[in-house]
Amino acid sequence: YDENSVYINGIEVHRPQLVSSGQQEGLSVINPDMVRSVAFSTGGFNAEYSDRMSSVLDITYKEPEAFEGAFSASMQGGSLALGTSTKKFSMLHGVRYKRNSSLLGGTDTKGEYDPQYFDYQTHIVLKPSKKFKVSFLGNVALNDYKFIPKNRETSFGTSTNAKTFLVYFDGQEHDKFQTFFGAMSLDFKPNKGNSFSLIGSAYQTNE
C-alpha cells in the first residue's frame, strides 16, 4: 500500500491508512468528472515521482475552456461537477455523495448499515501571463461509517456434509474519517524547452 503513489496535476496526494476490511473506505481520491488524462506506470518511472517501488498513478485535471458541467445520480448517491473560464482564469469544482447501505446489506454479516461519504474538490488556475501560471488544488473528504451488527451466518463443508455457523453480535461500530488537502503551485515557462515549478501543500486527517 505504501509503495503506490497517486499524483494529481504533479502534486502527490497523501491518503490515510484505511481499515483493512475495505467496507469503511468511501470515495476514491480521484473525481472522474474532473479528469482530463490518466497515466499509469508499474515501474521504471522518472525520479520526479520519488522513490516508491511499486506503481505511480498520475492524474491531470481539466482546465475548462468554457462553462461546462456534469451530473449523475443513482440509488447510492450522486455527483455534480461545474467549471468555467475566462481568458486568464479557470475553475473547476466537483461534489460527490455516496451511501451504499443497500450494497453492504447483502454481505454475510447482517445488521444496520449507515455509511455516508462526502467529497469536495476544486481546481483553480490563474494565468497572469503566457509564462506564469498559478494553480490551486483542494480536497475535502468526510466519511461517516455506522454499523450495528446483528448476526453472521457462515456456511462451510462439502455438498454431502454441509455445516452452518451462526454468530450473534452485541455492540456497534462508528468510524469517522476527515481529510483536508490543499496545494498551491507556481509554474514558470521561459521558453518551449524549459519549465520550472514551485509547489507547496498541506495535509490533515482526523480518524
What are these regions (language model features)?
Residues 18, 105, 135, 140-156, ...:
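Outer-membrane beta-barrel and related beta-rich outer-membrane complex signature
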Residues 11-40:
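Short acidic/polar hinge/loop motifs at secondary-structure boundaries
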Residues 24-28, 40-43, 47-69:
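N-terminal periplasmic accessory domains that precede
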Residues 23, 109-113, 150-164:
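Flexible, surface-exposed loop regions and adjacent strand-edge segments
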Residues 1, 11, 43, 62-64, ...:
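Solvent-exposed coil/turn segments that connect beta secondary-structure elements
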Residues 19-23, 40-41, 62-65, 103-108, ...:
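Extracytoplasmic loops and strand-loop junctions of Gram-negative outer membrane beta-barrel proteins
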Residues 76-97, 110-148, 172-204:
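Transmembrane beta-barrel wall of Gram-negative outer-membrane proteins
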